[in-house]
Amino acid sequence: MLYSDNAEPIYSFRINRVEPWYIPFISRFLGPIRYDNFLGDLKGHVHPNAPWVFGDKLSVHPFNDFEIGIARTCTFGGEGYSPVNFHTFFKCFFSAGSSTLSGAKEDAGDRRTSLDFRWRLPYMQKTVTIYTDSNADDDINPLANVRRAGWQPGIYISHLGKSGPLNKMDFRFEAPYTNQPHNAGINYTNGNYRDGWTNQQNVIGSWIGRDSTGYQAWLTYWLTPRENVQLQYRDAKIDTALWPGGGTQTDFGVNVIKRLSPNIELNGMVQYERYLIPILRPGVQRDTSAWVKITWYPQIQKRLF
């Protein structure tokens, strides 16, 4: 929920190890360790203009079927705020305090954290995996205040049956929520950085957005390892505590991936959407969209000289 492809990619400098670390003695207990970092600037912000953001994530794999990770990001700098330099970077990285003064030069930044895990359940023939992701604003970890955080639990079943057509089908279900009745709109927002956790005016985190709850499901039938037909369903409810009149958004789609030849792939999707969001437009709205993509994979032969 902290970082997704819901928004335009951030132009950034990234450091990421290709293979996991195996640290003597420590990896005996924590298993393989992955560490990922990035630093870049955000676009489309007005209050303030041109802020920067950094993020880092640490994940460990203590057991064969269990993985857990923690992550954090911090938006800092921007027009009228502290300049972007090593001092403000390290202050944003290490500070545990907060500033409520709008435009304050000593503002540590807009900080948020995340906790995620993935567990492939035992005694299920390694076919069922449960997982969750989270987002917490101005908390050192989502577990520090579970009720303030947004959560996105999910389940993945790699095979619905042992043989026949069901053996070629997988199923995924997720139920994200960010609505907090006691503290509306706390996720993906900030008092000083008023454009919130966005890039090009789109939320960088989960598609569920601010103060909403919903669920999403995918049912996929695999024709071959490279070809499939997928049914998608998504429903979201916008809380009236933040948005006047609330709202509902529902969409259903069919996606097909087909290989026309070993080097050419056809990918197409049709989606139907129905939504009722009074603050945007009165009455029930409906729309249908479709797209087709053709991908060519050239065969490049390596020659030894």
Question: How would you label these PLM feature ranges?
Answer:
Residues 173, 219, 256, 268, ...:
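Hydrophobic, well-ordered secondary-structure elements that form the walls
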Residues 243, 278-282:
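Flexible, solvent-exposed loop segments that connect beta-strands
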Residues 12-197, 210-217, 222, 233-242, ...:
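Signature for the C-terminal beta-barrel architecture of outer-membrane proteins
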Residues 19, 202-208, 253, 271:
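Extracellular/periplasm-exposed beta-strand and loop segments of Gram-negative cell-envelope proteins
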Residues 12, 58, 258, 269, ...:
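Outer-membrane beta-barrel "beta-signal"
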Residues 1-12, 18:
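Aromatic-lined, polymer-binding surfaces characteristic
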Residues 249-279:
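C-terminal structured domain segments
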